[in-house]
Amino acid sequence: MSDTTLEKIIVLDYGSQYNQLIARRIREIGVFSELMSHKVTAKEIREINPIGIILSGGPNSVYDEGSFDIDPEIFELGLPVLGICYGMQLLSYKLGGMVEAAGEREYGVAPLQLTGKSALFAGTPEVQDVLMSHGDRVTAIPEGFHVVGTSPNSPFAAVENTERNLYGIQFHPEVRHSVHGTEMLRNFALNICGAKGNWSMENFIDMQIKNIREKVGDKKVLLGLSGGVDSSVVGVLLQRAIGDQLTSIFVDHGFLRKGEADQVMETLGGKFGLNIIKVDAQKRFMDKLVGLSDPETKRKIIGNEFVYVFDDEANKLEGVDFLAQGTLYTDVIESGTDTAQTIKSHHNVGGLPEDMQFQLIEPLNTLFKDEVRALGTQLGMPDEIVWRQPFPGPGLAIRVLGDLTEEKLETVRESDAILREEIAAAGLERDVWQYFTVNTDVKSVGVMGDQRTYDYTLAIRAITSIDGMTADFAQLPWDLLQKISKRIVNEVDHVNRIVYDITSKPPATVEWQ
């Protein structure tokens, strides 16, 4: 964020699978936090002006050649520093301590025994469960440090040098398995770093509106509106900031959920007054996809065609200088650090032609998904948009296995509407992370009205998750599943069988394609 007066704690990224959680937990306390590359220098940190620094965990060994390092001048800034797991080992190693391979690795929940008073552990019990996940351990601490906590396999599980405001813990306070981890992070942020804890979504809105107005001035902004949560929130935020200087292009490719296109136009165009150019490109997309079965081919064609349609419409407009996107903080982290690995491609408007000379505006690029929903609520947006299900860019087209036909597409659109209606009626729409139907491209024999049928089998996929990285299948009530199945078979043509996907992630992904 550009505002250097904002209280913030930065997290240096050393590759831990939990590093995003650290920033999230600090934000939940009411202090803004963001991840930064471990390559950041002390000089750059001075310019950022944080009130504290956290060193994340990571998979490396600090004593190996080429392991992720730190500018040693960072320890001389006079800022509170908290090292977590690898971060603790790095802090100890760089300041003269010793780190070696543990004789016995420590993975899972372990009891932490506090051995002395510490501001970091204020208000937490003397013995508490914490999550350990390390193959190395500190075997000698630097001069000026003393031990405040031990575990069965880590004699230096928590250490500190209060004179220099340096703290190290071998475990992960950011995960829920560390029962009092949030209290430790709160102690670090509020008591040790001296944060006021007053960062809120309301403050974020005021700051972003100010930033947008300063950046845009009297120029025009173009937004690719998908109807999803992210682009919708961007649209409403920009509308509040710059009003009629914003033009949104909404491409209806024909693979949206039932009633979605109309809802976007009525809510965002009507209630919130966005200037929306709706492009009906359903035939254009379908003509390109009819008969195709390979999911990657479908994705590429839809992505490319979207770019062409968007480009055609953008070229009709004059005097547009800025392009707005709904990029989230998770996208920035995945693409912007040297510790991240790409698992699958995104479907955002990221592949726009290079000759479209726009400056980017990404007002959500410091927010996580749950924070975007909170922002939408703060902006007065209705729940049906704010809590809309995550939806892939290619839409329902990748929820049809095998060759894509209008008939199969309609089975998914209608059955999905029934599923969403019944989940909402049961009051479970916020308990289930994501839910949808899939046309499996499998036909089976059935009997309906005393006649033999040979129709499609649809699958219901419903999952529970915290962050979407891992997921369990949702254990929906049997009577609810029975009701959904009965409605789909009776109300949706060409369907005679429903199955329920009971696979977790991993090994499966959320989507079938």
From Swiss-Prot:
One of its GO terms (molecular function) is GMP synthase activity. Pfam families: GATase, GMP_synt_C, NAD_synthase. This is GMP synthase [glutamine-hydrolyzing]. The active site is at C85, H172, E174. The lineage of its organism: Bacteria, Bacillati, Bacillota, Bacilli, Lactobacillales. Coiled coil: none annotated. ATP binds at S226, G227, G228, V229, D230, S231, S232. Homodimer. Residues 8-198 form the Glutamine amidotransferase type-1 domain. It comes from Lactococcus lactis subsp. lactis (strain IL1403).
